[in-house]
Amino acid sequence: MTVTLPSVYSPQEVERKWYKYWEENGFFHTEPDEREPFCIVMPPPNVTGQLHMGHALDNTMQDILARYKRMQGFNTLWLPGTDHAGIATQAKVEEELRKEGLTKDDLGREKFLERVWAWKENYGNRITEQLRTLGASCDWKRERFTLDEGCSEAVKEVFLRLYEKGLIYRDYYITNWCPHCKTTISDIEVEHLEREGKLYYINYPLEDGSGYLTVATTRPETMLGDTAVAVHPEDERYRELIGKNVILPLVNRPIPVIADEYVDKEFGTGAVKITPAHDPNDFEVGLRHKLPQVVVLDDDAVMNENAGKYRGLDRYEARKKIVEDLKDLGLLVKEEEITHSVGHCYRCDTVIEPRLSKQWFVKMKPLAEPAIEAALTGKVKFVPERFTKIYLNWLYNIRDWCISRQLWWGHRIPVWYCDECGEVIPSREEVKSCPKCQSTKVHQDPDVLDTWFSSALWPFSTLGWPQNTEELKYYYPTSVLVTGRDIIFFWVARMLFMGLEFMKEVPFKEVLIHGLVLDAQGRKMSKSLGNGVDPVEVIASHGADSLRFMLVTGNTPGNDLRFHFERLDGARNFANKLWNASRFVLMNLEGFTPQGIKQEELTLADRWILARLNAVIDRVTAFLDEYELGEAARELYEFIWDEFCDWYVELTKPRLYGKMPGGDTAREVLYAVLKTTLELLHPFMPFITEEIWQRLPHEGKTIMLAPWPKGRADYENPEAVKQMSSLMEVIREIRRLRAEVNVPPAKRGEVILVTADEQLTRLLNENAWAIAALAQSEPRVVPKMEVPQGALTGVAAGVTIYLPLKDLIDLEKEKERLNKELKKVLAEIERLNQKLNNPGFLAKAPAEVVNKEREKLTAFYREKEVLEQRIGMLSHEL
């Protein structure tokens, strides 16, 4: 029994209703069974975050795949969750405390963590609720959090097993210190940005008074921690100085001149200062030469007690003062303006300070090797394939991973220290006393683990590991990971090596990479530019289906996507087009019960639309299997808008309105095509398709569990497609000719179709009704004819078309209108010629502007030619 649709589509009302229905009926939930599994783990968004366009794209793509596989009969689990986001979340709560005039230290660790958990409870559900408005068909009953009990147990277990294997160690090392976030961050959390700076040339006096050694540096404030000057062993200029001492300016400490191949002879003077405590390369040089490590900056990037009289100065103030003092001493040779790469914290954009500190590290080489092998042997595949090379290059050059963070919010490192004997005690349980000396004076490491450490375990920790649960056995390895190209190193690579280490299998078989969502000008969306678009607002104004469809049709794997409001409006127009066509179909299906399609009763249009439906089923299925989601969506858009709505629905009207026989057959075909098309479109636009599908005769409780459409052999009909294509070409050309001279749509007249081809003649005569209905013209088919006077001429599909104008338009008025158009065009040609002949314009205007104006001029000349031809033809007739 069909039920008609309201005249206007209201997305908000429809979306709320159906999401509630799906969730309450448990359609998203699944348990292991005998079916083939399909599993996706959601990249966990920050628990305190808000839905942004990147999330909207990422989760739309995952939802399309989940809904598609569910309809194909797979046991489909899309596992959702959120990330505790150490630095970001702690910063949010500290910001709140600052408003109250407090710091985290005022509260103490325990009370501060209570505040963070309270913040998480207040704001943690915001993003998951926003994902619901997008239509995400996740199994919310299985929602996880990286700090929940199960994930915390997994994190502790992984840390301790790696520690026991010797793959986690603690050592002094140069790390990336963020003075604003007050923590170490890993190499890949550092953004290297090109910045203007200066290269300072400084004279270091030789200890024997025989002269100077000139070094070049961009960071004179760190010279207070220099413990050597290095030159290349093959640099003839300095060979005799190797082994001698220079006096460190401002500190007056003798330091050696050493030879090391690390030095670039061509950079600066070929002599470089070595500061092992404040530069990663210098640190390595220092280890090779057993140099002391002098730290001169504290946690706030302020000069410390080793900086002498500069103690207490901010690093940039110290730089300024040191340069002034060097000038006064006559030791500053020169300053050179340069552009160089400067590391910034990816969270807060503060300039990173390389700094010596004791941290926890994961030894990466043994873990990277299996992850490299997995990509080389095809155990894991990247889509597009070009990202395999990017992934491998990073793993080939990987450094040990610094995993400790100087934060309170996160997974605390499961290691205790004995205050009496210094014993290091890794433990799964809380340590009360030292196993070595039995002292009860023990304390836990204050640091927490890098957020990405727990995220790296996501594909197996969320399925119950370290317990060997039914879910873990059934759903692991997961099927595909959908994620942005910006976190291949942060997350994808780490999940791969952790999965291989602890599960002995890759965590996912394929990685589908998408790009970033940029603004219309191709810029990253950011608060500072004020160019962000809020998906929640877009859903409120245009509906979730329109946003989803716009995002996916503008997307190709691995490439960035530009957000255009015009395309969003286009997606909404598409939803309205589908709604209106469906409303028409439903109005004509009242009291209809499907009986099945009888081939012998089908018209050419029926046979054509069913054959085209078959092709669309095959193409959409193939595109989805290849992760070409944008191509699949475009295929559906063109079929629904152009072929179904604009052609087939229009061609059924004479039959439905009783002007021709075959109304029942038209209803059967309309029903079959609309229902199947809705099922194909459902993964992309879940809400509107459910709303319409539920009003059609159907089996089952929801479209999301309807079987995925399959092509039918009896729908195949290449001949019908070929014939219909010819008929459509002829109709389009007649329409074009009528539009050229502004024939009113209601004005009907004769059109002469000239062809000697018997098959074409039969096709045109049998479908004269279609030409009359869609081209508002009465066709007369003849084998040959001279060009009639006062007729427009066209050619389509091997048919010559004559459109006599005499009875269609007022020839005098049309000539007058065309002359006015010609006058405007001539004025534009004159204006553009003057502009393009102006030397001032050509000299000042950008090349693309000049080219655009030239293109306009060419187009106007073409228009002038067409108008003159039409005026000539009308003048001849008059």
UniProtKB/Swiss-Prot annotation:
Gene3D superfamilies: HUPs, Isoleucyl-tRNA Synthetase, Domain 1, Valyl-tRNA synthetase, C-terminal domain, Valyl/Leucyl/Isoleucyl-tRNA synthetase, editing domain. Pfam families: Anticodon_1, tRNA-synt_1, Val_tRNA-synt_C. A motif ('KMSKS' region) lies at residues 524-528. It catalyses: tRNA(Val) + L-valine + ATP = L-valyl-tRNA(Val) + AMP + diphosphate. ATP binds at K527. Keywords: Aminoacyl-tRNA synthetase, ATP-binding, Coiled coil, Cytoplasm, Ligase, Nucleotide-binding, Protein biosynthesis. GO terms for biological process: valyl-tRNA aminoacylation. One of its GO terms (molecular function) is valine-tRNA ligase activity. A motif ('HIGH' region) lies at residues 45-55. It is found in: Cytoplasm. One of its GO terms (cellular component) is cytosol. Its EC number is 6.1.1.9. InterPro entries: aa-tRNA-synth_I_CS, aa-tRNA-synth_Ia, Anticodon_Ia_Val, M/V/L/I-tRNA-synth_anticd-bd, Rossmann-like_a/b/a_fold, tRNA-bd_arm, tRNAsynth_Ia_anticodon-bd, Val-tRNA_synth_C_sf. Monomer. ValRS has two distinct active sites: one for aminoacylation and one for editing. The misactivated threonine is translocated from the active site to the editing site. The C-terminal coiled-coil domain is crucial for aminoacylation activity. Catalyzes the attachment of valine to tRNA(Val). As ValRS can inadvertently accommodate and process structurally similar amino acids such as threonine, to avoid such errors, it has a 'posttransfer' editing activity that hydrolyzes mischarged Thr-tRNA(Val) in a tRNA-dependent manner. This is Valine--tRNA ligase.
